[in-house]
Amino acid sequence: MSQALKNLLTLLNLEKIEEGLFRGQSEDLGLRQVFGGQVVGQALYAAKETVPEERLVHSFHSYFLRPGDSKKPIIYDVETLRDGNSFSARRVAAIQNGKPIFYMTASFQAPEAGFEHQKTMPSAPAPDGLPSETQIAQSLAHLLPPVLKDKFICDRPLEVRPVEFHNPLKGHVAEPHRQVWIRANGSVPDDLRVHQYLLGYASDLNFLPVALQPHGIGFLEPGIQIATIDHSMWFHRPFNLNEWLLYSVESTSASSARGFVRGEFYTQDGVLVASTVQEGVMRNHN
């Protein structure tokens, strides 16, 4: 396991304060606030700690209410909404400075047989031979602002290989579609619940910026503000984050200073394992 992956697993492994109450640390990725995927992953960890082990998260719906401070810990307060014969529901509040910054409602279910069908995986080049985002960042290190340089060129917990590179510092006009391959940078423990909250973390990577592509804007360009409003995810089938997953993302709308994106995770052999939807603020202050 790489040190970067070990650090992320430690970050997402919360300290239990008392029943239903957890504390998580924050990481600074060089962004303007706490990375949304961190809050999602930590909230999923907190929620799963309160349900029977055989019940796995199959969906969550969340709202980001305030920017999180990457220099302060976050408290996660888990409320039990229901424990039924088949499903468990939890509501999680993420709190900083005495105020909620995020709410999540998550539903859990034990594996159960039933009807099966899925969308066909879109075509995409294989990940072999594609450069990783870290390799791309290292090749562009001389162009990176000092505040971002160390964050972007360091070893990362997840290896991300874009099919087409979109420069966050200088965008180019493109169709609102993006495909990236993602896998863990090292070996994730053999526990599907761990893989699920790691994928929750990963689901916020290469997501909302896709809505900027038709406008030729990179999300780190001066004067550009983007921030998640809500983020939802559905886990359809088991998966292994030690193996490549294709994250296929599209933006179907942008209006009223908001961008809308949706994505799908597929295994290399075409199994649809998860779906995502997000809406966020997109403003050009220039």
UniProtKB/Swiss-Prot annotation:
It catalyses: a fatty acyl-CoA + H2O = a fatty acid + CoA + H(+); tetradecanoyl-CoA + H2O = tetradecanoate + CoA + H(+); (3E,5Z)-tetradecadienoyl-CoA + H2O = (3E,5Z)-tetradecadienoate + CoA + H(+); dodecanoyl-CoA + H2O = dodecanoate + CoA + H(+). GO terms for cellular component: cytosol. Gene3D superfamilies: Acyl-CoA thioesterase, double hotdog domain. GO terms for molecular function: fatty acyl-CoA hydrolase activity; identical protein binding; protein homodimerization activity. Pfam families: 4HBT_3, Acyl_CoA_thio. Disruption phenotype: Deletion of this gene decreases the growth rate of cells on conjugated linoleate but not on palmitate. Deletion of this gene also decreases 3-hydroxybutanoate, 3-hydroxyhexanoate, 3-hydroxyoctanoate, and hexanoate in medium after cultivation with oleate as a sole carbon source. Changing S107C: 2-fold reduction in catalytic activity. Inhibited by iodoacetamide and diethylpyrocarbonate in vitro, but is insensitive to iodoacetate treatment. Has been used in the engineered enzymatic high-level production of enantiomerically pure (R)- and (S)-3-hydroxybutanoate, used as a building block for the synthesis of optically active fine chemicals, such as vitamins, antibiotics, pheromones, and flavor compounds. Chemical synthesis of chiral 3-hydroxybutanoate (3HB) is not economically feasible. It is an enzyme of class 3 (hydrolase). GO terms for biological process: acyl-CoA metabolic process; fatty acid catabolic process. Thioesterase that has relatively broad substrate specificity, hydrolyzing primarily medium- and long-chain acyl-CoA substrates to free fatty acids and CoA. Functions in the thioesterase-dependent pathway of beta-oxidation of oleate and conjugated linoleate ((9Z,11E)-octadecadienoate or CLA), which provides all energy and carbon precursors required for the growth of E.coli. Belongs to the C/M/P thioester hydrolase family. PANTHER family: ACYL-COA THIOESTERASE (PTHR11066), ACYL-COENZYME A THIOESTERASE 8 (PTHR11066:SF34). This is Acyl-CoA thioesterase 2. It comes from Escherichia coli (strain K12).
